[in-house]
Swiss-Prot record:
Residues 1-21 form the signal peptide. The lineage of its organism: Eukaryota, Metazoa, Ecdysozoa, Arthropoda, Hexapoda. Expressed by the venom gland. Keywords: Cleavage on pair of basic residues, Secreted, Signal. This is Vespin.
Length: 67
């Protein structure tokens, strides 16, 4: 499992997890500007985290629409 996914899936505060995920995502896209493969990987990480947290709190689904 990706270290970011593991860390976020063990966070109790979902708002903090959402903020951390947003920062990670923005950094990845910034590092490889226009890198399609990297963007797809970032999206995959977001989808996986949504699935991990879905049963705990449906508000995490907001992340999906913000990208």
């Amino acid at each position: 499992m990706h270290p970011i996914i593991w860390e976020l899936s063990h966070m109790v505060d979902l708002q903090a997890a959402a903020q951390k995920l947003k920062r990670c995502y923005q950094r990845r896209v910034a590092i490889t500007a226009g890198g399609l493969k990297h963007r797809l990987m970032s999206s995959l990480i977001i989808i996986i985290i949504i699935r991990i947290n879905y049963l705990r709190d449906n508000s995490v689904i907001i992340l999906e629409s913000s990208y």
